[in-house]
């Protein structure tokens, strides 16, 4: 036999006007905030990932693949010097 936790049933919550008043504002706000975070380029700055125009430089147009097993550190250093 299960006990009562005292919480409202989920069906009561999602059918209440208060739920939809709150969430009709917060859900679009979160979407707009995420879109602005990505479209302004702040996401690239925060996470340190290169912007789409920085993947390939003028001096290096090939894909930076690590091909050697024993000289991988030198290859990584060579790739990072071009940034």
From Swiss-Prot:
Main localization of the protein described in the UniProt heading: plastid
GO cellular-component term (any): photosystem II reaction center
List of residues binding heme: 23
Gene Ontology biological-process annotations: photosynthetic electron transport chain
Stored Gene3D superfamilies: Photosystem II cytochrome b559, alpha subunit (1.20.5.860)
Essential cofactor(s): heme b
Entry's localization field: Plastid, Chloroplast thylakoid membrane
Database matches in HAMAP family: PSII_PsbE
Alphabetized PANTHER family for the sequence: CYTOCHROME B559 SUBUNIT BETA-RELATED
Protein name (database record): Cytochrome b559 subunit alpha
Species in which this protein is naturally found: Physcomitrium patens (Spreading-leaved earth moss)
